[in-house]
């Protein structure tokens, strides 16, 4: 069983046609809505100014000034490249906007819906800036539609997908591996219409140090193509402390007329806790709704996403129990990658991007010897 913390959760990379994020500097004036990068505990994070900050007030680091700065999350301090469209909608610009228009805010990497017709004097702040205006009317100009297309693979959700029409799609991003952030594995969730995935990892000199391909993601079931996996796992435990570039190439399955789709990419530290015992139980939480008309008995359906719940027992050694339990508790309050596959299996349904609802360690004895941890893991919503 493998447990992995995802360093890419909330990744806000600087993509093509998107302005770079400057480093925060004390004592320098910052205009309203400007974004700055600041490293917290070894991890670079992005911040956006709620207001115009004069030089004399810009003395406290963004992470310690929540009234001045909006935390945008981990940004990776890298350039993100992809051939997927940044957004399905046109870029926001000043000028008159018709009600019902959806536009892409490149500063926030999100799409926004215009709630009302805006005149040129009204449409001077970007949608993300309007959301934090002190004027209630201005806050109501736009409605947040969520993360834009190219960035959905890094938004920490598997049901929002990055899409590209064509025979393939790629993404490329950097990762600085050191004591504060390590890559032991790469997981891809929420794949659709994909027949193979290739992972290449390049060092700072441009030499490939990893080159792995997972294929045969589809098989025939009585003549019909069937998807074998919605997720994949790559092992990158051989990487040493250095700066790397990760590139993932997704190839569309033969005959597919729709787009290549990826839900989420996870890169991070992985911990192998021990083998999963036989008797694992899997069930799904179905959030769809069915309603029957009381007069005629007709049934209407509202299709929604599902979430998996995995109940499993993992074997370990009693001397390791303190370390394991402390590690699990250290990452509470957020989603992790849970992979209950053993070394000889690679089942998609035994992987979850979610959280531990409950875990316990029933000691069979206090002496050195075998022990076990019982997990109940609930995944986030899939197939939304």
Q: Where do the language-model regions lie?
A:
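Tryptophan-rich substrate-binding surfaces of secreted polymer-degrading and adhesive proteins
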Residues: 1-155
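Extracellular/virion structural assembly segments
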Residues: 1-17, 145-211, 215-384
């Amino acid at each position: 069983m493998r447990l992995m913390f995802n360093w890419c959760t909330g990744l806000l990379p600087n993509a093509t046609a998107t302005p770079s994020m400057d480093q925060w500097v004390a004592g320098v004036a910052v205009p309203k809505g400007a974004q700055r990068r600041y490293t917290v505990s070894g991890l670079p994070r992005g911040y956006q100014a709620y207001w115009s900050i004069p030089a004399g007030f810009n003395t406290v680091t963004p992470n310690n000034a929540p009234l001045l700065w909006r935390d945008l999350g981990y940004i990776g301090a890298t350039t993100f490249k992809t051939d997927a469209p940044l957004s399905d909608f046109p870029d926001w610009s000043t000028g008159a906007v018709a009600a019902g228009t959806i536009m892409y805010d490149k500063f926030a990497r999100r799409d926004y819906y215009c709630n009302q017709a805006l005149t040129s004097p009204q449409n001077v702040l970007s949608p993300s800036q309007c959301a934090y205006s002190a004027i209630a009317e201005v806050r109501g100009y736009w409605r947040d539609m969520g993360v834009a297309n190219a960035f959905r693979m890094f938004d920490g959700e598997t049901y929002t997908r990055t899409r590209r029409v064509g025979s393939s799609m790629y993404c490329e991003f950097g990762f600085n591996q050191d004591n504060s952030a390590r890559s032991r594995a790469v997981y891809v969730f929420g794949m659709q219409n994909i027949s193979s995935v290739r992972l290449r990892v390049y060092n700072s000199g441009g030499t490939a140090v990893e080159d792995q391909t997972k294929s045969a993601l589809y098989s025939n079931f009585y003549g019909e193509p069937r998807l074998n996996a919605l997720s994949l796992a790559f092992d990158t435990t051989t990487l040493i402390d250095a700066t790397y570039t990760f590139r993932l190439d997704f190839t569309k399955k033969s005959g597919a007329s729709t787009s290549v789709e990826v839900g989420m990419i996870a890169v991070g530290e992985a911990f192998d806790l021990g083998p999963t015992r036989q008797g694992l139980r899997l069930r799904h939480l179905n959030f769809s709704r069915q309603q029957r008309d009381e007069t005629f008995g007709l049934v209407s359906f509202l299709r929604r996403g599902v979430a998996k719940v995995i109940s499993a027992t993992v074997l370990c050694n009693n001397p390791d129990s303190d370390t394991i339990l402390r590690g699990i508790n250290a990452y509470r309050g957020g989603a992790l990658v849970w992979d209950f596959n053993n070394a000889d299996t690679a089942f998609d349904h035994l992987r979850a991007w979610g959280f531990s609802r409950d875990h316990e360690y029933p000691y069979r004895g206090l002496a050195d010897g075998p022990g076990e941890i019982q997990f109940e893991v609930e995944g986030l919503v899939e197939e939304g």
